[in-house]
């Protein structure tokens, strides 16, 4: 048992508010202890946690609960403890896994049985997207004439605009005239086009952007008024105030100034200068994945946007992604943030472009939950440092061509050297503040839709743009274009929210093909035409997406396993059914790793708006331009679609731990079984009601078996391991109208196949086969006719004065239940009596109360069956429509007859006749209308 004091402490900690929990986290002793995270099933009770602490007391020390994730708890273990020999990740990251170490088998098995997952928490350091050094800035010269008359005229207009805006809004900030990203005086039009929104008083009111960075100088005169302390925390020094402490802790403050620098007389002005900023400090020292996860959702009820200008090192060598618990935290952010509308995560694409780096090798920027922002300079050109990839959604302004972003700095200074994609991300975050201020009801996916649909394409001659399914242009360099604040905000004002998210996972596609280059092999002239390419594809059907409730594509991901002797020489792309190409892996000359890609996920936003239906092709190829030996083994891959749901009411909550490929297979199998069950039941009913002899029933059952054997699951077919198809293309893409039609179509197909397979048979054999098929075909037509007559009788009412009335003897008929064939006019007087005898109005058998001898009942049944069959045959083959006044069966008018009977019983005989005449005239008109409707349908 746990000591009472410890038990009280644990319960008190778990019940304390979130802020108090952060304040109660004890200091970490990484020198003497290892830390790990345990996931326990404590959703309904804290007993599993209490039991775990009690059981492992003396082995592991309880530290604290992870506030960002339910059911996750931090423990520590002394580095000298023997359990360190097998302790590792379990149901978590796919490295440093738990090992069933010799001598600790029982300890291993026991620990695994107690927990749902274990995550090791080693120290790590995240890298800032630091501004590119000025001496390394690429100065791009173009053919623009800075001294031309047109340019002078344009700049004169820009100066006049600047003066007017400053006067109207009373702007006196000394650096405002140098903030070209707000009003570009030298290259007019190459700015974020925000001043029109300012004049409309759209200034970011009510929106808070968290700078997940190295701190924010909340004491700066340019920041203080717009600083939000509730959304702030220092994870490096464990405190409420995220003030910069190190000499290079200026990054977050500069980013904050871009967004929300106050309109005053200090430095410049923020793009959303009435919004607020908070600081979440994580980049000023080593942290663990639990700290990072906490940071990504800290102040989730306060912060709307999380601006992140950091990630793996931008050196063209690193392949890195967030740990599983960080991914879980981001999923929590988009599911629970902003009152369930979802927090907005904005990431800088990276500054490794000059090293050949790509943002698809960065698991933060290629997350579907991130808006990845690249950079353009003040001329609108693509800087060399800005990383391009298929995950880039938009670009906005930053340093390049000798110019930088002018913003607030630490120590009461102003900065004129802020740049890189780390300056582009907060500028975009400020624009998203304006968007949310104008329309706070947008979800996280709506913000991405607005980015895709209202960004402005730029440098169309440079970016290898492709036209997408939405008739939008997409470039790996520029995404869907630059952020035009005025255009995007006004687009967002009238935006109607999309339906909730849905997703599709394919099966894992085994490839296991190898490419090997040799020194003697001649190198190709272009990267896009390598001598060897491994091809694979997956066919996504309409049925696949429908069963998973997916209407259209937003993001696609490709999870791969590729072994390589030189990772930087591997290239990969995916081609959609519409022909849009996403470059997933590009060559990186500095990446000489031999680890390849192990369960690595690439992402693309280039296919936004596609249906997803059709063949998705992947190509893996090698850079053999060096003339040395490189080997690539493409083992397997999995294709995933994330998009809008068909039916929002059926939308689910995404769980990263679930295997949605297995769920899809289960749903398809369940639907298949239900379809078989429905078809079998319908076929059996048809055989019973239309066949008087045993031979007819056998024929119908046989036809049903034929249909069952020809139907196949229309799930995704894997091109690399193709199987023989058992259905025609029409069966795959056209819905089945009825069982009878299916039987007929199947029989026709079987007939055609039989003719092809038996070309050498004699004429007698062919005649016999044709005769059998003709009989079955006629029977199918009869069944169709029978069903059509039933439907007509079910849904078309007839007048109450017809000749055919319900008989009073109470006998039952299988085909037309509850109908009266009597010509008597006094049937209304006996309606209540007949209703008392009948307690069901369903088609089929009734619960009759009369006792009739078996022989009498059988004779009556046979007679009625013969009469009914003759009538059906006459009606079906008639050249004119029946007289609905006299010959139409009457279903569903019992209540009307009952009411008429009650009125007739109360009224005098003479008035009864008048009423009957009037009613008959009304019903004659109704019958004429019904007659017209039937003629139209026929």
UniProtKB/Swiss-Prot annotation:
Region called Disordered, residue ranges: 671-768, 798-938
Glycosylation sites per record: 41, 193, 441, 512, 539, 599
Secretion signal, residue range per the UniProt entry: 1-20
Biased composition (Polar residues): 711-735, 902-919
Main location (coarse class): Golgi
Chain ranges of the Peptidase S8 domain: 179-489
PROSITE patterns (alphabetical): P_HOMO_B, SUBTILASE, SUBTILASE_HIS, SUBTILASE_SER
Source organism superkingdom: Eukaryota
Disulfide bonds: 267-414, 359-389
Active site positions: 213, 251, 422
This protein's UniProt keywords: Calcium, Disulfide bond, Glycoprotein, Golgi apparatus, Hydrolase, Membrane, Protease, Serine protease, Signal, Transmembrane, Transmembrane helix, Zymogen
Catalytic reaction(s) noted: Cleavage of -Lys-Arg-|-Xaa- and -Arg-Arg-|-Xaa- bonds to process yeast alpha-factor pheromone and killer toxin precursors
Stretches of the chain found on the membrane's Cytoplasmic side: 796-924
Database matches in SUPFAM superfamilies: Galactose-binding domain-like, Subtilisin-like
Comp. bias regions, Low complexity: 677-691, 850-859
Membrane topology: Single-pass type I membrane protein
Basic residues composition-biased segments: 798-808
Cell compartments where the protein resides: Golgi apparatus, trans-Golgi network membrane
Biased composition (Basic and acidic residues): 832-849, 860-874, 921-938
EC number(s) reported in the record: 3.4.21.61
PANTHER family named in the record: NEUROENDOCRINE CONVERTASE 1, PROPROTEIN CONVERTASE SUBTILISIN/KEXIN-RELATED
The family this protein is said to belong to: Belongs to the peptidase S8 family. Furin subfamily.
Name of the featured protein: Kexin
């Amino acid at each position: 048992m746990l000591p009472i004091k410890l038990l009280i402490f644990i319960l008190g900690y778990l019940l304390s508010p979130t802020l108090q929990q952060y304040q109660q986290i004890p200091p970490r002793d990484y020198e003497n202890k290892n830390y790990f995270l345990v996931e326990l099933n404590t959703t309904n009770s804290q007993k599993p946690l209490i039991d775990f602490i009690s059981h492992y007391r003396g082995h592991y020390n309880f530290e604290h609960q992870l506030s960002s994730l339910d059911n996750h708890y931090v423990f520590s273990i002394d580095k000298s403890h023997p359990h360190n020999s097998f302790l590792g990740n379990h149901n978590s990251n796919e490295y440093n896994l738990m090992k069933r170490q010799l001598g600790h088998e029982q300890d291993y098995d026991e620990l695994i049985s107690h927990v749902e997952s274990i995550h090791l928490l080693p120290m790590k350091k995240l890298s800032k997207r630091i501004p590119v050094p000025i001496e390394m800035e690429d100065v791009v010269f173009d053919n623009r004439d800075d001294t031309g008359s047109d340019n002078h005229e344009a700049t004169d207009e820009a100066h006049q605009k600047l003066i007017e805006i400053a006067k109207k809004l009373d702007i006196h900030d000394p650096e405002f005239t140098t903030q070209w990203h707000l009003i570009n005086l030298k290259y007019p039009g190459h700015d974020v086009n925000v001043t029109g929104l300012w004049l409309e008083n759209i200034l970011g009111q009510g929106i808070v952007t968290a700078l997940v960075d190295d701190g924010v100088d909340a004491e700066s005169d340019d920041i203080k008024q717009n600083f939000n302390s509730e959304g702030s925390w220092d994870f490096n020094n464990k405190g409420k105030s995220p003030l910069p402490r190190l000499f290079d802790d200026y990054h977050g403050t500069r980013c904050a100034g871009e967004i929300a620098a106050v309109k005053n007389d200090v430095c410049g002005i923020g793009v959303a200068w009435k919004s607020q900023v908070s600081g979440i400090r994580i980049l000023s020292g080593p942290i663990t994945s639990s700290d990072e996860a906490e940071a990504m959702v800290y102040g989730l009820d306060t912060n709307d946007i999380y601006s992140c200008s950091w990630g793996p090192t931008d050196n063209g060598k690193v392949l890195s992604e967030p740990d599983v618990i960080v991914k879980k935290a981001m999923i929590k952010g988009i599911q629970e943030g902003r009152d369930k509308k979802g927090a907005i995560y904005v990431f800088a694409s990276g500054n490794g472009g000059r090293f050949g780096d790509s943002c698809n090798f960065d698991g933060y920027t290629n997350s579907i939950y991130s808006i990845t922002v690249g950079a353009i300079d003040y001329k609108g050109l693509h800087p060399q440092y800005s990383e391009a990839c298929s995950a880039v959604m938009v670009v906005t302004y930053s340093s390049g061509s000798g110019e930088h972003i002018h913003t607030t700095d630490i120590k009461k200074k102003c900065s004129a050297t802020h740049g890189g994609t780390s300056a582009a991300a907060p500028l975009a975050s400020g624009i998203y503040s304006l968007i949310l201020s104008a329309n706070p009801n947008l979800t996280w996916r709506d913000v991405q839709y607005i980015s895709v649909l209202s960004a402005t394409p730029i440098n169309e001659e440079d970016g290898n743009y492709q036209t997408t399914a939405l008739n939008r242009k997409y470039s790996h360099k520029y995404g869907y274009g630059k952020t035009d604040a005025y255009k995007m905000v006004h687009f967002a004002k009238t935006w109607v929210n999309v339906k909730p998210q849905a997703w599709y996972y394919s099966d894992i596609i085994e490839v296991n093909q190898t490419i090997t280059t040799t020194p003697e092999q001649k190198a190709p002239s272009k990267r896009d035409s390598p001598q060897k390419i491994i091809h694979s594809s997956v066919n996504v059907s309409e049925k696949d997406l429908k069963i998973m409730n997916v209407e259209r594509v937003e993001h696609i991901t490709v999870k791969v396993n590729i072994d390589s002797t030189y990772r930087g020489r591997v290239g990969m792309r995916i081609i959609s059914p519409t022909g849009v190409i996403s470059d997933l892996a590009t060559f990186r000359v500095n990446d000489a790793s031999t680890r390849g890609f192990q369960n690595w996920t690439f992402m693309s936003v280039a296919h936004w708006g596609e249906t997803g239906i059709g063949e998705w092709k992947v190509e893996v190829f090698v850079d053999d331009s060096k003339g040395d030996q490189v080997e690539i083994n493409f083992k397997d891959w999995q294709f995933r679609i994330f998009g809008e749901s068909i039916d929002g009411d059926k939308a689910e909550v995404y769980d990263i731990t679930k295997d949605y490929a297995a769920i899809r297979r289960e749903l398809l199998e369940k639907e298949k079984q239900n379809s078989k069950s429905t078809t079998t039941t319908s076929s059996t009913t048809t055989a019973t009601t239309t066949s008087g002899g045993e031979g007819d029933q056998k024929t119908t059952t046989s036809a049903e078996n034929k249909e069952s054997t020809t139907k196949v699951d229309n799930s995704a077919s894997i091109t690399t391991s193709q199987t023989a198809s058992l259905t025609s293309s029409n069966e795959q893409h056209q819905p089945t109208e009825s069982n009878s039609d299916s039987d007929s179509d199947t029989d026709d197909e079987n007939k055609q196949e039989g003719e092809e397979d038996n070309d050498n048979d004699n004429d007698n054999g062919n005649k016999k086969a044709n005769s059998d098929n003709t009989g079955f075909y006629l029977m199918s037509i009869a069944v169709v006719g029978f069903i059509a007559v039933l439907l007509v009788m079910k849904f078309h009412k007839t007048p109450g004065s017809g000749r055919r009335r319900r008989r009073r003897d109470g006998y039952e008929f299988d085909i037309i239940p509850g109908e009266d064939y009597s010509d008597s006019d006094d049937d209304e007087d006996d309606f209540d009596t007949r209703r008392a005898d009948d307690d069901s109005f369903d088609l089929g058998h009734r619960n009759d109360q009369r006792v009739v001898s078996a022989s009498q009942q059988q004779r009556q049944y046979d007679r009625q069956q013969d009469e009914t069959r003759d009538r059906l045959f006459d009606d079906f083959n008639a050249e004119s429509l029946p007289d609905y006044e006299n010959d139409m069966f009457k279903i569903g008018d019992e209540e009307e007859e009952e009411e008429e009977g009650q009125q007739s019983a109360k009224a005098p005989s003479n008035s009864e006749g008048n009423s009957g005449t009037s009613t008959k005239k009304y019903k004659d008109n109704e019958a004429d209308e019904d007659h017209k409707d039937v003629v139209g349908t026929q």
